[in-house]
Structures are given as structure tokens and as C-alpha cells.
A protein has these predicted regions:
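Carbohydrate-binding surfaces of carbohydrate-active enzymes
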Residues: 1-198
Length: 198
């Protein structure tokens, strides 16, 4: 973008408005209509890492429009984005930029998902989070319970654990639950899932 005095913000706003509406109408709603016509729920999330939910290129430019057409709102918590006691500081993370904006992940992201789930009647109050990914093998069942509770009190009520991998070892964003018997915390994970399903 080149500076054009007071005109540049107006152009940027009009561009983002037009592109994010086209994304909603020509992508999300089309996929959602196809899924429902074939008896499949359309769920997922966009890239929210490092506040990219409001940017084009790395994400869709508008959180609410980008999920319009889905049967649940969606988000993910990965890469040490949420850590106890780190909510008010930017801390190191293994995501793009090598740091994590604790305020966004602790106070905003889950509320975006739960708000959308309540604003869109067709979502029936369902807010989904892909959770536990890329915290590494040191992520304990105790921390996972803390993370589930953290999300529940913010209105997230459906969870997709990351990840169950058919191969071990798999370098993609551990932990991997089960891990062909190599995950010593798998018994704790089963207990956690029973807790979460209540």
C-alpha cells in the first residue's frame, strides 16, 4: 500500500470489506451448502495465529465472515499460545514471529468463537476448538485439563484433540495420543476425555 493521505484508510477498508464478503459468499457458504446437502457438518477454523484472523494472505481477513456457512464456529489453540500466568505478556512461542500475544489468546480468541456460535442461530451455540497441538511431548494431562477448563469457561463447548497419528514417530506438532504405546500419559488422556464429555 502506498500512502495517499486520508484516502488510503478508506481504500483499505473498502478492499477488505469487499474481499472478505467474497470469501464468505464464494467459499465458506458454498462449502457449507454442499456439506449440508450431503449430510455432513461443516466445521473447521481459520488461521488465527499472531492475530492473522484479521489479515488477508495468511488468513481470511474477517473472523466472522470467514466462518459464516459453517455448522459450528471454530478456532484452535496451539504452539504455546495459552500458558498459565502468561496472559499479560508477549512470550516466546514456536509460531510465526517467535512470540505469542497472550492478551489475544487469553481474552479474545475463545470469546470470538463463543460469540459467533451464539450470534448465528444455525450454529446452535456450538463453538469448536482444535486443542493440544504443538505443545510438545511435555504437555501433561494436568495442563490439558487446565486448557479444557480455560476454554469451557469462555464458552467453547466442542473439542477436537490434536492429534491421533497413524504413524510413530510423527514430527507434526506433537503430542500424539496413543503413539503406538509410546505416550506414557495416554491413560491420563482417556480420563481427561471422560471429564470433557461430561
Amino acid at each position: 500500500w502506498f500512502g495517499m493521505d486520508d484516502f488510503a484508510p478508506k481504500v483499505r477498508h473498502a478492499y477488505m470489506n469487499a474481499v472478505s464478503k467474497l470469501y464468505r459468499d464464494c467459499f465458506c457458504r458454498k462449502i457449507g451448502d454442499w456439506c449440508r446437502a450431503h449430510g455432513v457438518m461443516y466445521i473447521g477454523h481459520i488461521i488465527e495465529d499472531m492475530n492473522s484472523h484479521a489479515r488477508l494472505g495468511c488468513s481470511a481477513g474477517h473472523y466472522f465472515r470467514s466462518l459464516d456457512g459453517q455448522d459450528m464456529s471454530g478456532m484452535d489453540i496451539v504452539l504455546h499460545q495459552v500458558m498459565p500466568g502468561m496472559e499479560s505478556i508477549i512470550h516466546t512461542s514456536s509460531c510465526a514471529g517467535n512470540n505469542s500475544d497472550g492478551e489475544f489468546y487469553n481474552y479474545i480468541l475463545a470469546k470470538l468463537a463463543s460469540s459467533m456460535a451464539h450470534l448465528k442461530p444455525e450454529m446452535k451455540g456450538r463453538a469448536m476448538c482444535e486443542v493440544f497441538g504443538a505443545y510438545g511431548w511435555a504437555e501433561s494431562a494436568t495442563f490439558m485439563k487446565w486448557l479444557i477448563d480455560f476454554l469451557l469457561v469462555r464458552g467453547v463447548n466442542n473439542f477436537v484433540p490434536h492429534a491421533f497419528s497413524p504413524i510413530y514417530p510423527n514430527p507434526d506438532c506433537p503430542p500424539h495420543f496413543g503413539a503406538e504405546g509410546h505416550d506414557p500419559q495416554f491413560e491420563g488422556f482417556k480420563t481427561l476425555m471422560r471429564y470433557t464429555n461430561k
